[in-house]
């Protein structure tokens, strides 16, 4: 039986280029999983094994690797930092027990760091902080620590102090032991010596050590009283308090170093062992009923329970179809039969393995706490599906993903590519819940939808290079929506008589604007039997089906509330079909009276620009209908936050590079829908109608 207290399921996440993947590489090197460390800038890293990742120097998928440190098993997930791939971060957080937040020593708390930190807070994932790249020009450990307080609202618990900075960075002082770890210039992680604290740092070390202990003992009233009386707690007691406060997210143990230069990585590994929780120390996953509502039961983390697991990632690589699974309860053995609770199908487990990024070790069994990959599942398993014991069917809390905001049309160039594309897209949709595909009913074109330009760019690249599909790609299209602005009280009667039994359904209703992000809601206040209750579902279905296409330009309709308050029926001619048709007619009749309005996706944009280009960048954002929300001066430039319509952001990366001589950076994520200005709405509606007329 494996000792779950020695398990650590952790994720590494941060902003693009803060050094997540390099940190992961160094962890694997130190734990003996790889013998030659690959470099991101050389396109050789272990966890970035897709062609697109190696070329772009960014992580797109979450790669899972297993390794060991001081008799503890680590399951490590290296997640993407680019906002278009935030879904990978989200679904990884769902199955992790702890994390390492990596921040750039010079860049500080960057936009995607903030987003990932917020997601981790929502998922209640305990973390340690690693301030990386202290050997870089402009690096400042203390400034980044301060930023984590101001920008993230975090409480960093400083555990080490840097010795030197930039080119003079040589190591760290461990505050608890008052020992200095100094590495030589060979770049080898094992080439370091432990010495006394440098004389010029003694006072600062004592100051920060006192703050560390004061914060830690707040977790234990007796220890705190003893400390206030002048008694220093034992090392064991301090570590116990730090572990407790880390698990409850009262603070975040904070380290520093240079992953690239192999300085300070051992301290992180020790911190993962000492302070991050094991699978048995986090809140168990809740179970739900078929409607997704919590039922008060939980997946207890124990190998003795019945099998319960969550499929959190589907991928197709050179080994075939892989389903990544976090086992919460029970044990899974080769040859066992399991149930996919979402599809109702059972399946016999053939092969399963633990992953070493793009390599794997075959397993005969796995248990609660493990993150594994099952090979070649046949039950149409998708991300978020619950896998369980057929004798004890359960449903784990679902994973919810954001809706796509941008679309492109793709057309295969020949028949061979058409067949390849169909197979490829089926696999890609299973792998990525934020990647959607539909066929335009009028033109027959295939429409790909995703989270941003880079997201779709990567998907098209995969279709072309991985699957050999020859494609013509259309211009990006914004996911406009329609809504209403006024309340309408109305009545509609559907009546049809053509020999034999006819059709009759009369409804009296109110249509009004719903709450933001409410979608479609239906309610009934009918008193008496004017409209029998058995017809309510048909009426709701009729209205809901019409929400897919609005009256302005055929865009889906958002945030509409329908209240049925009266109506009429015929004992012979009324039926569910008749009332469903009545509801559809009512929608067509009343929506034009309710002040229909075109709304557009607004993006939360975060731009970094050098000081000498701030005016140009802000002027450009204003021309893009941007609303500046905040400006924050940093050491190397200015960070500008703004809300900007997605339609104005196409090609922005090129414009920003031109304005800032290649030094500017930006990220964006969907924020909300907002009404289009009249001139914009008129043009969008006219262009859409013209485009539809040509189909």
From Swiss-Prot:
Q: What does this protein do?
A: Catalyzes the GTP-dependent ribosomal translocation step during translation elongation. During this step, the ribosome changes from the pre-translocational (PRE) to the post-translocational (POST) state as the newly formed A-site-bound peptidyl-tRNA and P-site-bound deacylated tRNA move to the P and E sites, respectively. Catalyzes the coordinated movement of the two tRNA molecules, the mRNA and conformational changes in the ribosome.
**GO molecular function annotations of the record:** GTP binding; GTPase activity; guanosine tetraphosphate binding; translation elongation factor activity
Q: What is the lineage of its organism?
A: Bacteria, Pseudomonadati, Pseudomonadota, Gammaproteobacteria, Alteromonadales
| Family annotation (InterPro entries) | EFG_II, EFG_III, EFG_III/V, EFG_IV, EFG_V, EFG_V-like, EFTu-like_2, G_TR_CS
Q: What name is this protein filed under? A: Elongation factor G 1
Q: Where is the tr-type G domain?
A: 5-280
Binding residues annotated for GTP, in chain numbering: 14-21, 78-82, 132-135
Q: Which family does it belong to?
A: Belongs to the TRAFAC class translation factor GTPase superfamily. Classic translation factor GTPase family. EF-G/EF-2 subfamily.
Q: Which Pfam families match?
A: EFG_C, EFG_III, EFG_IV, GTP_EFTU, GTP_EFTU_D2
Mention any one GO cellular component term assigned to this protein in its UniProt record.
Answer: cytoplasm
Q: Which UniProt keywords apply?
A: Cytoplasm, Elongation factor, GTP-binding, Nucleotide-binding, Protein biosynthesis
Primary site of residence: cytoplasm
- Tell me where in or outside the cell this protein is found: Cytoplasm
What SMART domains does this protein map onto? EFG_C (SM00838), EFG_IV (SM00889)
Q: What are its GO biological-process terms?
A: ribosome disassembly
């Amino acid at each position: 039986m494996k000792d779950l207290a020695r398990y650590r399921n952790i994720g590494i996440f941060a902003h693009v280029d803060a050094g997540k993947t390099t940190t992961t590489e160094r962890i694997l090197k130190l734990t003996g999983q790889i013998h030659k460390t690959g470099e991101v800038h050389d396109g050789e890293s272990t966890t970035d094994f897709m062609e697109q990742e190696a070329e772009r120097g960014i992580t797109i998928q979450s790669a899972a690797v297993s390794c060991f440190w001081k008799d503890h098993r680590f399951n490590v997930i290296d997640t993407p930092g680019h906002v278009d791939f935030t879904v990978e971060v989200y679904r990884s957080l769902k199955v992790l027990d702890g994390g390492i937040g990596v921040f750039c020593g010079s860049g500080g708390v960057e936009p995607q760091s903030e987003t990932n930190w917020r997601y981790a807070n929502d998922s209640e994932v305990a973390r340690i902080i690693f301030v990386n790249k202290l050997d870089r020009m402009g690096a400042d450990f203390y400034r980044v620590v301060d930023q984590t307080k101001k920008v993230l609202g975090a409480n960093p618990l400083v555990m080490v102090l840097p010795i030197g900075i930039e080119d003079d960075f040589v190591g760290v002082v461990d505050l608890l032991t008052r020992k200095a770890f100094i590495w030589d210039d060979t770049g080898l992680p094992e080439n370091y010596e432990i010495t006394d604290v440098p004389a010029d740092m003694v006072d600062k070390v004592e100051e920060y050590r006192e703050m560390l202990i004061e914060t830690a003992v707040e977790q234990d009233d007796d220890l705190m009283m003893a400390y206030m009386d002048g008694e220093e707690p034992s090392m064991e007691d301090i570590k116990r308090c730090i572990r407790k406060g880390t698990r409850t997210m009262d603070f975040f143990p904070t380290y520093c170093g240079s992953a690239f230069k192999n300085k300070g990585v051992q301290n992180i590994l020790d911190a993962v062992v000492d302070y991050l929780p094991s699978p048995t120390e986090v809140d168990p996953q809740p179970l739900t009923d078929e409607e997704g509502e919590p039922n008060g039961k939980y997946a207890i983390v124990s190998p003795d329970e019945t099998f319960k697991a969550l499929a959190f990632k589907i991928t197709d690589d050179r080994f075939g179809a892989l389903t990544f699974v976090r086992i919460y309860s029970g044990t899974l053995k080769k040859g066992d039969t399991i149930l996919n609770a979402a599809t109702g199908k059972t399946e016999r487990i053939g092969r399963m393995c633990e992953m070493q990024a793009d390599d794997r070790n075959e397993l005969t069994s796995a248990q609660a706490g493990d993150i594994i990959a099952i090979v070649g599942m046949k039950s149409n398993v998708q991300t978020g599906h619950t896998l369980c014991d057929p004798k004890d069917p359960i449903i784990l809390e679902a994973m919810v993903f954001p809706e796509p905001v941008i679309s492109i049309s793709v057309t295969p160039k020949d028949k061979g590519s058409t067949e390849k594309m169909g197979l490829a897209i089926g696999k890609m949709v299973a792998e990525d819940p934020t990647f959607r595909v539909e066929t335009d009913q009028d033109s027959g074109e295939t429409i790909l939808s995703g989270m941003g330009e880079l997201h779709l760019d990567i998907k098209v690249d995969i279709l072309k290079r991985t699957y050999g599909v020859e494609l013509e790609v259309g211009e990006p299209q914004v996911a406009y929506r329609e809504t209403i602005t006024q309340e309408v009280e109305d009545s509609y009667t559907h009546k049809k008589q053509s020999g034999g039994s006819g059709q009759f359904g009369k409804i009296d209703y109110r249509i009004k604007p719903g709450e933001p992000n409410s979608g479609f809601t239906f309610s009934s206040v009918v008193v008496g039997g004017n409209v029998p209750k058995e017809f309510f579902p048909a009426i709701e279905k009729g209205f809901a089906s019409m929400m897919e296409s609005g009256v302005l330009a055929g865009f889906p309709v958002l945030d509409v509330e329908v209240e049925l308050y009266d109506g009429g029926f015929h004992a012979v001619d009324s039926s569910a079909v008749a009332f469903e048709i009545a509801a559809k007619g009512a929608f067509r009749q009343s929506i034009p009276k309710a002040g229909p309005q075109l709304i557009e996706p607004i993006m939360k944009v975060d731009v970094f620009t050098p000081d000498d280009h701030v005016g140009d960048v802000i002027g450009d954002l204003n021309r893009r209908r941007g609303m500046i929300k905040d400006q924050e001066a940093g050491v190397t430039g200015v960070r500008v936050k703004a809300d900007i319509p997605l339609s104005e952001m196409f090609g922005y990366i090129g414009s920003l590079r031109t304005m800032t001589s290649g030094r500017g950076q930006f990220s964006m994520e969907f924020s909300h829908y907002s009404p289009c200005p009249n001139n914009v709405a008129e043009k969008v509606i006219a262009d859409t109608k013209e485009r539809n007329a040509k189909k």
